[in-house]
Amino acid sequence: MDEKDNSRSSLQTAADLGRAAKAAYRIAQAAAVSGVHGAAAAAVKETVPALIKFLLAVLLIMIVIPMVVFTALPNIFFGYDSSNTASVIHMTEQAMRIGGAYMSLDDFERTQIDSIVTGIAAEYEADGTAIDHIEVKNTMKEDDLLWIIAINSAAYEQDLDAMSAELIQNFCRSTLSYQPSLSLLGGSPSTTLEVEIKRIDPEELMEQMGFNEDARQWAGALFETLKDSGALEKYGGYFSAYQPDYSGDGSYSGDIQHGTSYDNDIDISRFVSPSTKNNLDLAAYAVQAWENNWGYVWGTYGNILTESLFAYKKQQYPDGVGNYADFIEANWLGRRTADCIGLIKGYAWLDASTMRIGYAANGMPDYGADQMYQAAKNAGIQGTDYGTVSSMPEIPGLMLWKSGHAGVYIGGGYAIEAMGTRKGVVKTEVSGRGWQGWCKLPYIDYLEVE
């Protein structure tokens, strides 16, 4: 029995070595033409003096490649304190952001799909078609996520300085393919909205991106290495802090003000320019949401929370929504709701001519709070377009930001924010609220107060 096990173990070892040799050949051949930048290059450079060639080869195959594709190798392998090389420290910080973006893709995919489905349901409801049930068929698998990581990494040749969380999310958004349809449930008048999210075709995606044979080979090598190494399971825990809190920023115990009305109508008579998107109308929109006591439900952006949408949200987010189901049903069902960044996106996506809130409309992307703030920083100038709260100018319609949360500055030292499930849309003082920064949203115009 032991001899049989030993023989099987030896055969398995030989097979593993054979696969490793084959993988090493493919990786080396592809890397020779595609180039390996960022963490892989720095890791090799810094570890050459201490590693013999065999160990270096094992490092390349078993550690560097799977980790550098999407995680912060310098932080994990060297640590911040074990390397004084400025380029490695910089690379570590950038790799943490990239790794976090990749490891957030599972939630990103879910929230993106959620936003799309929410928008489709709202369109049907606005056209007079009552949706009784929502069913989502998501056929995407872990392999799709691995292909997204591999193809995107190959497209940037592993150059961490050329990559960003925003670019990764834009790329992932472009890979989503969906098809909505309506059906009668069991032949009854009950209407079901069915949305199918399709799997990606890596060959078609690489063709669309103009990959040559070398780039295809490199992406394939990265995919196989990620899959064989189990890198997602091994290193995903390093980025748990990037997972969203679906219940909002409800831990605040300071003074908050609620509105005194309850109305689902959106009155654009207060807008200074309904046909454009600007800061003054954003502030007016936010104030109106507060006055009318809009609720908070993750993944909504000014939509009326119907029975079918609520049922879908409970299924989609059993913790963040399901755990608060009784409270939401008692307080927010049948009313307009938004999450923190959804309050801002709802204004941007509102078509003032039809009074419909679309999806990713009018140039405003479907970003979370952190991504929206980063986009503003990327597009602006510090001190003029973004900065710390202590430097904030007196301009209504600025976005206020803290990690994972956003609000709208309305002037006079006050903000409107969709605070959390149990708070809804509230008015708070900026001072003492813990805001970390402010920014001008790059997707709307900023007008002066007359």
What kind of feature is each model-predicted range?
Residues 1-18:
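Lumenal/extracellular segments of secretory-pathway membrane and secreted proteins
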Residues 4-8, 22-25, 29, 33-291:
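Membrane-proximal envelope biogenesis segments
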Residues 21, 27, 31, 38, ...:
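Polar low-complexity intrinsically disordered regions enriched in Ser/Thr and small residues
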Residues 137-140, 393-394, 432-436:
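Short, surface-exposed loop and linker segments with low hydrophobicity and enrichment for Pro/Ser/Thr
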Residues 143, 214, 238, 242, ...:
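Acidic, low-complexity intrinsically disordered regions
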Residues 247-357, 403-405, 416-418:
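N-terminal capping segments
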Residues 335-338, 345, 353-427:
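...with weaker cross-activation on analogous glycine-rich loops/strands in unrelated enzymes
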Residues 431-450:
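Low-complexity, Gly/Ser/Thr/Pro-rich intrinsically disordered linker/tail segments
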